[in-house]
């Protein structure tokens, strides 16, 4: 069997040429001589950390024209996680826009050697993900429809083709493969040195060893960065310090939710069957075996991801800090932890049984709770940016460097990547939570990725609503920015288990009942996870007029407004409620809380507005009451007249519901008659109980976010993050009603939007109906017309009113007319779809207005 050879590395302090695949030992990209001992007292940008990501950012900033870029590295370039990485590169990612990051990385790596003259050791033999279960085949089909509208080259291939590409495989269990021809691996050391050469060429000062000893923010937003060599005053700093990132953050009072994880890989000696091949083997990913395997010279390199029970966190570093001298060292190897993966690999690739181990590498990689990196500006600290938490730093480095460079230079992200926003974490993200989630994320590295996936480690956090104890045994909870929120409710005798699937599963019928509950009677939903901000001060109206594309509502009223980027893209959607003269309540989605708050705060500081901005998200609970009997139920509990003529649509009032103070806004994302009731979080349980008791005669019941999604789609309500984000402008998203280009204020994005309108749109958001079987669109599926991909869905659901699937989709303007026939790809099959007149179901305010108009006529 696979056995240890003469060279067995057990916890030695290795130099950069040891404990690595032999390609790194060759030093193909040998570093150029160190930069001269110069120093800069001023810099536009200071980057902290000389790993692959930090050097990539320096390279991209300088190449794009930024002068005075300084990179500070505490020891030497690649120290930390870069030098010992396995160097895998892949076009594949289950996320949508992260595919662009991977694409940009690979395209950079393909041309970098020619540009810099530095060999980078880039191999592109392709890669194959193996499916050995029917569920995995479904996952491949699911990922194909999410990829077909991108530039990525990707195919599902049959076992015969897999064996042709990788003839050393045992084919007994293999059902299919997901094949990316351009995938491969690169030498991380050589790559970093090539980027460093390019960075120097464009004027970057790379200083090492130059450990940062303190960071001091100045009143004007600049920073004093202290090192033993001297101080640099920077307009901005970027923390790209790898597993040292927490230490850097702590210098300014931040505790970044990161934890080092031990990851091992094994390198074998020459294997005769590998040596005899005439071409390099593709990288192999055995997903059920949870390992990757690639050719390393004439042997193989094999890296497993252990289960969360067996994997090892470097928790002592979180508790006590990274050992001061740790840079190019490794941990002691532990083959016992990976025995089951070794056995799985030997079964799948039998030649491994005869191979000798010549290297075992066990080094630290840094995980965030959800395994995705944290990239962008940080809320609450001016001009502090991060590029940290890279579990897959090599494939992300090139693309993230370009992405962050574009954002810094142009004032907005080049495309939407809110899943990487460092502000997705908040004070609720404790060390205990981070450890639990990192363990789960590592152990789940290769599990099947279902839509509507939930992961349960570290839950609940301290951020539970006042209804959690009441509702937890009645529903399936979802996780939203630290909050627990009901997705769907079950009744006695119904299946209550979490059963993820690519098809309709056990939530389908209960959600249909909740839909009918809201449409025919009255329902209650916990909306406490909303982000909530209080803005007041003498310049509050001017600030919001500058930020929002809609007009500012009158006192006592509410509207929907959008904050746009300078290029006219939709940065955020807000509910703006004018509570009293100069005082506003702003509401945003749970996942956008700190993302939106940072944008608002930055605009306030940059414009010198005299305002007070408070994040009151954790102070307020929110209950939504919706349905034809909503008014009847609430009227029993208040002396306030809730009639249509007195409490108008979009009006806001302070009142009492059964002696509990609330701010009531007549609005509902269901599109039905409804109110959102904002109240002290400690009053949530009492308010809920009194509303439920009052509504017994009307048949009141709960509903969750799955039913809410079906209801809002039928009303053609857009959702931020799906129908609109930093990839879309509001005109193509059909938000014209909310965009007031004629308002006096020169709001952010106004001029760009005028140009977009003058040039005309290339695509448009449309509503589709589909006749499917047991599968519904989720969003990001490919839309086909005459054998070509012409667009993509953004979100979808089953419509319980017409018993068909419903979806939003972007299609070319010339194919956007009502009645146009297209196809939507779901799980490998193209289903006929028809563009319909939206909305499918009129909203309650529209129905009421039409009834009144009819009576008048």
Swiss-Prot record:
<keyword id="KW-0496">Mitochondrion</keyword>
<dbReference type="Pfam" id="PF08669">
    <property type="entry name" value="GCV_T_C"/>
</dbReference>
<feature type="modified residue" description="N6-acetyllysine; alternate">
    <location>
        <position position="786"/>
    </location>
</feature>
<feature type="modified residue" description="N6-acetyllysine; alternate">
    <location>
        <position position="427"/>
    </location>
</feature>
<dbReference type="InterPro" id="IPR027266">
    <property type="entry name" value="TrmE/GcvT_dom1"/>
</dbReference>
<feature type="binding site">
    <location>
        <begin position="73"/>
        <end position="74"/>
    </location>
    <ligand>
        <name>FAD</name>
    </ligand>
</feature>
<feature type="transit peptide" description="Mitochondrion">
    <location>
        <begin position="1"/>
        <end position="43"/>
    </location>
</feature>
<feature type="binding site">
    <location>
        <begin position="80"/>
        <end position="88"/>
    </location>
    <ligand>
        <name>FAD</name>
    </ligand>
</feature>
<dbReference type="InterPro" id="IPR006076">
    <property type="entry name" value="FAD-dep_OxRdtase"/>
</dbReference>
<protein>
    <recommendedName>
        <fullName>Dimethylglycine dehydrogenase, mitochondrial</fullName>
        <ecNumber>1.5.8.4</ecNumber>
    </recommendedName>
</protein>
<dbReference type="InterPro" id="IPR036188">
    <property type="entry name" value="FAD/NAD-bd_sf"/>
</dbReference>
<feature type="modified residue" description="Tele-8alpha-FAD histidine">
    <location>
        <position position="84"/>
    </location>
</feature>
<feature type="binding site">
    <location>
        <begin position="676"/>
        <end position="678"/>
    </location>
    <ligand>
        <name>(6S)-5,6,7,8-tetrahydrofolate</name>
    </ligand>
</feature>
<feature type="modified residue" description="N6-acetyllysine">
    <location>
        <position position="757"/>
    </location>
</feature>
<feature type="modified residue" description="N6-acetyllysine; alternate">
    <location>
        <position position="469"/>
    </location>
</feature>
<dbReference type="InterPro" id="IPR006222">
    <property type="entry name" value="GCV_T_N"/>
</dbReference>
<feature type="modified residue" description="N6-succinyllysine">
    <location>
        <position position="312"/>
    </location>
</feature>
<feature type="modified residue" description="N6-acetyllysine; alternate">
    <location>
        <position position="516"/>
    </location>
</feature>
<dbReference type="InterPro" id="IPR028896">
    <property type="entry name" value="GcvT/YgfZ/DmdA"/>
</dbReference>
<feature type="modified residue" description="N6-succinyllysine; alternate">
    <location>
        <position position="786"/>
    </location>
</feature>
<dbReference type="GO" id="GO:0006579">
    <property type="term" value="P:amino-acid betaine catabolic process"/>
</dbReference>
<dbReference type="GO" id="GO:0050660">
    <property type="term" value="F:flavin adenine dinucleotide binding"/>
</dbReference>
<feature type="binding site">
    <location>
        <position position="669"/>
    </location>
    <ligand>
        <name>(6S)-5,6,7,8-tetrahydrofolate</name>
    </ligand>
</feature>
<feature type="modified residue" description="N6-acetyllysine; alternate">
    <location>
        <position position="141"/>
    </location>
</feature>
<feature type="binding site">
    <location>
        <begin position="390"/>
        <end position="395"/>
    </location>
    <ligand>
        <name>FAD</name>
    </ligand>
</feature>
<feature type="modified residue" description="N6-succinyllysine; alternate">
    <location>
        <position position="648"/>
    </location>
</feature>
<dbReference type="GO" id="GO:0035999">
    <property type="term" value="P:tetrahydrofolate interconversion"/>
</dbReference>
<feature type="modified residue" description="N6-succinyllysine; alternate">
    <location>
        <position position="469"/>
    </location>
</feature>
<dbReference type="GO" id="GO:0005542">
    <property type="term" value="F:folic acid binding"/>
</dbReference>
<keyword id="KW-0809">Transit peptide</keyword>
<feature type="binding site">
    <location>
        <begin position="52"/>
        <end position="53"/>
    </location>
    <ligand>
        <name>FAD</name>
    </ligand>
</feature>
<feature type="modified residue" description="N6-acetyllysine">
    <location>
        <position position="107"/>
    </location>
</feature>
<comment type="pathway">
    <text>Amine and polyamine degradation; betaine degradation; sarcosine from betaine: step 2/2.</text>
</comment>
<keyword id="KW-0285">Flavoprotein</keyword>
<dbReference type="Pfam" id="PF01571">
    <property type="entry name" value="GCV_T"/>
</dbReference>
<feature type="modified residue" description="N6-acetyllysine">
    <location>
        <position position="353"/>
    </location>
</feature>
<keyword id="KW-0007">Acetylation</keyword>
<dbReference type="Pfam" id="PF01266">
    <property type="entry name" value="DAO"/>
</dbReference>
<feature type="modified residue" description="N6-acetyllysine">
    <location>
        <position position="328"/>
    </location>
</feature>
<feature type="modified residue" description="N6-acetyllysine; alternate">
    <location>
        <position position="648"/>
    </location>
</feature>
<feature type="modified residue" description="N6-succinyllysine; alternate">
    <location>
        <position position="141"/>
    </location>
</feature>
<dbReference type="InterPro" id="IPR032503">
    <property type="entry name" value="FAO_M"/>
</dbReference>
């Amino acid at each position: 069997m696979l056995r240890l050879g003469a060279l067995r590395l057990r916890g030695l302090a290795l130099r950069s040429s040891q404990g690595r695949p032999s390609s790194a030992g060759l030093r193909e990209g040998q570093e150029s001589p160190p930069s001269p001992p110069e120093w800069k007292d001023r810099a536009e940008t200071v980057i902290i950390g000389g790993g692959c990501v930090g050097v990539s950012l320096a390279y991209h900033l300088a190449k794009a024209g930024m002068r005075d870029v300084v990179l500070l590295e505490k020891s030497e370039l690649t120290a930390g996680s870069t030098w010992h990485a396995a160097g895998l590169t892949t076009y594949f990612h289950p996320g949508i826009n992260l595919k662009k990051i991977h694409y940009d990385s690979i395209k950079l790596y393909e041309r970098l050697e020619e540009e810099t003259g530095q060999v980078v050791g880039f191999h592109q033999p392709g890669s194959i993900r193996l499916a050995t279960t029917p569920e995995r085949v479904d996952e491949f089909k699911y990922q194909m429809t999410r990829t077909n509208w991108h530039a990525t080259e990707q195919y599902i291939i049959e076992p015969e083709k897999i064996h042709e590409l990788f003839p050393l495989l045992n084919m007994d269990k293999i059902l299919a493969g997901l094949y990316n021809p351009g995938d491969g691996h690169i030498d991380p050391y050589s790559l970093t040195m090539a980027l460093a050469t390019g960075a120097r060429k464009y004027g970057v000062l790379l200083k090492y060893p130059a450990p940062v000893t303190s960071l001091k923010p100045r009143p004007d937003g600049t920073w004093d960065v202290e090192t033993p060599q001297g101080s640099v005053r920077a307009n901005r700093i970027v923390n790209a310090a790898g597993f040292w990132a927490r230490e850097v953050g702590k210098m300014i009072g931040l505790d970044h939710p990161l934890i080092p994880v031990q990851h091992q890989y094994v390198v074998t000696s020459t294997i005769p069957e590998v040596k005899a091949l005439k071409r390099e083997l593709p990288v192999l990913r055995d997903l059920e075996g949870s390992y990757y395997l690639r050719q390393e010279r004439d042997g193989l390199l094999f890296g497993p991801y252990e289960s969360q029970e067996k994997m090892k966190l470097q928790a002592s570093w979180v508790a006590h800090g990274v050992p001061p001298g740790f840079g190019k060292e490794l941990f002691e190897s532990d083959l016992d932890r990976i025995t089951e993966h070794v056995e799985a690999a030997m079964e799948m690739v039998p030649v491994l049984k005869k191979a000798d181990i010549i290297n075992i590498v066990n080094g630290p990689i840094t995980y965030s709770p959800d395994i995705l990196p944290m990239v962008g500006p940080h809320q609450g600290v001016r001009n502090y940016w991060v590029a940290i938490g890279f579990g897959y730093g090599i494939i992300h480095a090139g693309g993230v460097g370009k992405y962050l460079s574009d954002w810094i230079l142009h004032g907005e992200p080049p495309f939407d990547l809110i899943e990487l926003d460092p502000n997705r974490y908040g004070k609720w993200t404790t060390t205990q939570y981070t450890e639990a989630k990192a363990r789960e994320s590592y152990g789940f590295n290769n599990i099947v990725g279902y839509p509507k996936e939930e992961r349960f480690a570290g839950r609940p956090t301290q951020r539970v609503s006042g209804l959690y104890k009441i509702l937890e045994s009645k529903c399936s909870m979802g996780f939203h920015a630290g909050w627990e929120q009901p997705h769907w409710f079950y009744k006695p005798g119904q299946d209550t288990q979490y059963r993820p699937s690519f098809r309709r599963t056990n939530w389908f019928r209960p959600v249909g009942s909740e839909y009918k509950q809201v449409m025919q009677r009255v329902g209650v939903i916990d909306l406490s996870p909303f982000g909530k901000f209080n803005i007041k001060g003498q310049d509050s109206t001017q600030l919001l007029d500058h930020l929002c594309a809609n007009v500012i509502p009158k006192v006592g009223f509410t509207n929907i407004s959008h904050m746009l980027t300078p290029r006219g893209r939709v940065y955020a959607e807000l509910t703006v409620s004018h509570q009293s003269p100069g005082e506003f309540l702003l509401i945003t989605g749970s996942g956008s809380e700190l993302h939106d708050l940072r944008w608002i705060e930055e605009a306030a500081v940059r414009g010198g507005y005299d305002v007070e901005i408070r994040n009151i998200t954790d102070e307020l609970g929110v209950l939504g009451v919706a349905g034809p009997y909503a008014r009847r139920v609430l009227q029993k509990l208040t002396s306030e007249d809730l009639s249509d003529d007195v409490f108008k649509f979009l009006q806001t009032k302070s009142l009492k519901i059964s002696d509990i103070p609330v701010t009531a806004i007549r609005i509902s994302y269901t599109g039905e008659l409804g109110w959102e009731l904002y109240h002290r979080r400690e009053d949530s349980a009492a308010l809920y109980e009194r509303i439920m008791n009052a509504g017994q005669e009307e048949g009141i019941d709960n509903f969750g976010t799955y039913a809410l999604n079906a209801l809002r789609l039928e009303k053609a309500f857009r959702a931020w993050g799906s129908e609109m984000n930093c990839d879309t402008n509001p005109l193509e998203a059909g938000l014209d009603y909310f965009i007031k280009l004629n308002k006096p204020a020169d709001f952010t994005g106004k001029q760009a939007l005028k140009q977009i309108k003058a040039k005309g749109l290339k695509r448009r958001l449309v509503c589709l109906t589909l006749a499917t079987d047991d599968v519904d669109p989720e969003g990001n599926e490919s839309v086909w017309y005459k054998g070509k991909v012409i667009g993509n869905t953004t979100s979808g659901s089953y419509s319980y009113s017409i018993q068909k699937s419903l979806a939003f989709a972007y299609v070319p303007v010339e194919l956007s007319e009502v009645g146009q026939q297209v196809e939507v790809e779901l799980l490998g099959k193209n289903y006929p779809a028809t563009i319909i007149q939206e909305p499918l179901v009129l909203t309650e305010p529209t129905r009421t207005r039409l009834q009144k108009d009819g009576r008048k006529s």
